[in-house]
Amino acid sequence: MKRATTLAVAGTLLLAALATPLPALAADPAPTLKPMLGVYLGRATVKDLDTQATEERDIDVEVTPFDRDGFRIRWVNVTLVDGRRNLPGVKRRVSELTFKPAKGRNFFVEVPQANVFAEREEVQPLGGDPVRWAVQDAAGLHVHSFVILGDGRYELQTYSRKRTDSGIVLHYERVVDGKLVRTIDGQAVKVE
């Protein structure tokens, strides 16, 4: 009789476990990230503060969930020639970064790109590898990249994206050894 009771209890627990809703296996980012998720298309102006040269870029930004509470950001920059993208000299650059929450902290850290054919290597900041992190706050989503340059100077890049009613406003700054050398400002609409 004890064996039958044990089996009955085990069966009941198994059924209860199967009937209990499980957390979604698909990505479910932190609630504060949800307004930022989406695909955005727009244009930005790049300004070199040393030369005062400017250039126009078409921008394509995609923010998607990663794992349970992280995010992936992918962006495409198309540097235009005379405001057009169908002329010789146009440049296209694609970048992608993935972030997950830092344990016990209120920011995100970069997740290294997976490569099944290579051994995982640790980030080497003194070897020139960038250290990247992201912060979500009331002003938007900010991605920071810090690099120690070969000559001992440093570079800090900050790319901020702020949600608007129709999309996002973008602002980028590149600082080398304390001096602001480049900015990018633009707007992008959310694609339905």
Where are these regions (language model features)?
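C-terminal segment of classical bacterial N-terminal signal peptides
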Residues: 15-24
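Edge beta-strand at a domain terminus
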Residues: 154-192
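N-terminal helix-cap/turn-to-beta initiation motif at the start of protein domains
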Residues: 25-41, 135-136
